[in-house]
């Protein structure tokens, strides 16, 4: 029986993580979780799983939950997130919160020697050097939950990582993969939220449409697997059947395939190095699919992917700037305050405005994050 703490239980990854726990009640126990403002959902999860600690975003929601929570301790805010991440009984902390708020709980959980199931892209993007140093220092495993990084992780199982020639990350292309730049001037929020393959939260769905999601994954892969950016490629693969590939020195390529279902990589992170049945996911029948398609990525068509490579290669504090600018811009687009292509423009402005700090401390990263958010808000 593995004890699980779940950060971000009401989001897309969080709800699917609970599906996995639900499927294997003899294997997993939920000891703590956090939610944002979805209190009705939190009540249902408490009633089903009886966790010991639950964290909410706002102090005013604490009393609402305490009235129905029985013996569950209710906490709130950033301190509450840390309490969930540091639950003494938790063996695995699944970080499924959205945004850079996931950074500090991850670092503290690593220091407490918890195994980390990492679905929060921004943690490695903004502070990859700090996270990986801490993981090495405390001998902690970072297990990828993203389908692409899980695919690479599985392809590398038993392999000599020094023999890697290239990582090939696949991209569905998002909601607007078939639209021209001119057509993108007129797309709506509703259009952007219709992802062709995956069921995800609103922020990551917009990131998929701009291709920033894939850019964040490139930076994540660099840190997780220690591969230079020059050896990480992205290929457009509309079917989302091949989740990623690894090319070795002898030019052999290993790929991980499967139906697009996030519960598969989530469960693998929780069961690693073992596997368990996942009976209600769709079996992959290649004869039904028939043909798989691949296209080279156009980084002028998908400018956010180019920004991510530029930020990653610049290193230091630049990825944190790019990430903070993107979070503010995406939120403004979702609120219909800016157009779709303005997201790219705001990110570019923020990156051009910033002078890179080569090895920023945690405090500097948090300061840069806040300053970038203020700068971008002033541009809107």
Swiss-Prot record:
Transmembrane segments: none annotated. GO terms for molecular function: 1-deoxy-D-xylulose-5-phosphate reductoisomerase activity; manganese ion binding; NADPH binding. Mn(2+) binds at residues 146, 148, 217. It holds the Pfam family DXP_redisom_C. InterPro entries: DXP_reductoisomerase, DXP_reductoisomerase_C, DXP_reductoisomerase_N, DXPR_C, DXPR_C_sf, NAD(P)-bd_dom_sf. It is an enzyme of class 1 (oxidoreductase). It catalyses: 2-C-methyl-D-erythritol 4-phosphate + NADP(+) = 1-deoxy-D-xylulose 5-phosphate + NADPH + H(+). Its cofactor is Mg(2+); Mn(2+). Catalyzes the NADPH-dependent rearrangement and reduction of 1-deoxy-D-xylulose-5-phosphate (DXP) to 2-C-methyl-D-erythritol 4-phosphate (MEP). NCBIfam families: Dxr, PRK12464.1. This is 1-deoxy-D-xylulose 5-phosphate reductoisomerase 2. It comes from Bacillus thuringiensis subsp. konkukian (strain 97-27).
């Amino acid at each position: 029986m593995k004890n699980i703490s779940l950060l971000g239980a009401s989001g897309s990854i969080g709800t699917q993580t609970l599906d996995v726990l639900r499927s294997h009640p003899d294997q997993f126990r939920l000891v703590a979780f956090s939610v944002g403002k979805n209190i009705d959902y939190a009540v249902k999860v408490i009633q089903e799983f009886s966790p010991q600690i639950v964290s909410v975003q706002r102090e005013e929601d604490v009393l609402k939950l305490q009235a129905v929570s029985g013996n569950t301790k209710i906490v709130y805010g950033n301190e509450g997130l840390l309490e969930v991440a540091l639950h003494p009984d938790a063996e695995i902390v699944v970080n499924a919160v959205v945004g850079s708020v996931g950074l500090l709980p991850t670092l503290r959980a690593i220091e407490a020697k918890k195994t980390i199931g990492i679905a929060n892209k921004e943690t490695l993007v903004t502070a990859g050097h700090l996270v990986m140093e801490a993981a090495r220092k405390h001998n902690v495993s970072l297990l990828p939950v993203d389908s692409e990084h899980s695919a690479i992780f599985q392809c590398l199982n038993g392999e000599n990582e020094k023999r890697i020639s290239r990582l090939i990350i696949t991209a569905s292309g998002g909601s607007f993969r078939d639209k021209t730049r001119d057509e993108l001037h007129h797309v709506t929020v509703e259009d952007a939220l219709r992802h062709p393959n995956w069921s995800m939260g609103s922020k990551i769905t917009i990131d998929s449409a701009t291709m920033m999601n894939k850019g964040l994954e490139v930076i994540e892969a660099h840190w997780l697997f220690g591969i230079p950016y020059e050896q990480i490629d992205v290929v457009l693969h509309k079917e989302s059947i091949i989740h990623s590939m690894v090319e070795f020195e002898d030019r052999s390529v290993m790929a991980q395939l499967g139906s697009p279902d996030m519960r598969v990589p989530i469960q693998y992170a929780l069961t690693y190095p073992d596997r368990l049945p996942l009976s209600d996911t769709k079996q992959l029948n290649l004869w039904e699919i028939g043909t798989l398609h691949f296209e080279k990525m156009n980084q002028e068509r998908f400018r956010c992917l180019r920004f991510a490579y530029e930020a990653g290669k610049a290193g230091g504090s630049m990825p944190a700037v790019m990430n903070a600018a993107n979070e503010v811009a995406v939120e403004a687009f979702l609120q219909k305050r800016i157009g779709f292509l303005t997201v790219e423009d705001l990110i570019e402005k923020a990156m051009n405005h910033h002078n890179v700090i080569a090895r920023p401390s945690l405090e500097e990263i948090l300061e840069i994050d806040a300053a970038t958010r203020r700068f971008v808000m002033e541009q809107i």
